[in-house]
Amino acid sequence: MGIRAIVVDTAGTTTDLNFIQQTLFPYSAKVMADFLREHQHNPLVDYCIGDVRDIALETDADIDRVAEILVQWIAEDRKVTPLKTLQGLIWKQGYANDEFKGHIYPDFIDAIKTYRAQGLRVYSFSSGSVDAQKLLFSHSDSGDLTELFNGHFDTRTGNKLDKQAYANIVNTISLTPRQILFVSDVVEELKAAEAAGMITCQMVREPSQRTGKYRIIQSFSELNFE
């Protein structure tokens, strides 16, 4: 049957990890407290604030304390939905104000155009929210790439280290697991995707990166589906 869809990780795969860690994360930490104070009556922000209180078991935490918790979670790279939702809202503000452009590796930009021309479907799966992924790809340093994607998945689909998340993706896009290629730089994510039956491939952008028993590529140009 062959590959009919490609699911790509973002940080470290389509996007320089340094952009996430040195630009996006610090920006969200810097403005978090002010953002919460300004938007605390927005229903979505208010819901996220309540979710943070519940997860942290601090139901009486005021806005400043909630901001402290969130900044700590950013430092710990916690993959919790309220944090990722709030970061997406904050980054939307940053992109709109031209604080930064989304970094996308040039080889992926060329590749995704080729994949779509070949009739392949392309999806992204990230611990960042779907909205944050759309922002990244719509405000990239090479323009708006969102029309080239068939969809995006985030923590609402499941934890990226959990087999069930990939099974959920398989069910959502209505293909068999062996018709889907998952590309990531993280060995544990590849292991979970493989357990769900997907074909896997590891992106190795850095020589010091930990590798596993998977096919290794250093660029999307090395993937050919003709």
Swiss-Prot record:
Function comment: Bifunctional enzyme that catalyzes the enolization of 2,3-diketo-5-methylthiopentyl-1-phosphate (DK-MTP-1-P) into the intermediate 2-hydroxy-3-keto-5-methylthiopentenyl-1-phosphate (HK-MTPenyl-1-P), which is then dephosphorylated to form the acireductone 1,2-dihydroxy-3-keto-5-methylthiopentene (DHK-MTPene).
Record HAMAP family: Salvage_MtnC (MF_01681)
Cofactor requirements of the protein: Mg(2+)
Subunit relationships: Monomer.
Source species, domain of life: Bacteria
BP term (GO), one: L-methionine salvage from methylthioadenosine
Cofactor: binding comment: Binds 1 Mg(2+) ion per subunit.
EC number: 3.1.3.77
Top EC group: hydrolase
Organism: Shewanella amazonensis (strain ATCC BAA-1098 / SB2B)
Coiled-coil intervals: none
Similarity section: Belongs to the HAD-like hydrolase superfamily. MasA/MtnC family.
The keyword Magnesium belongs to this UniProt entry's keyword annotation: yes
Name of the protein this chain belongs to: Enolase-phosphatase E1
Reaction equations catalysed: 5-methylsulfanyl-2,3-dioxopentyl phosphate + H2O = 1,2-dihydroxy-5-(methylsulfanyl)pent-1-en-3-one + phosphate
Keyword Nuclease: no
Keyword list, A-Z: Amino-acid biosynthesis, Hydrolase, Magnesium, Metal-binding, Methionine biosynthesis
InterPro entries: Enolase-ppase_E1, HAD-like_sf, HAD-SF_hydro_IA, HAD_sf
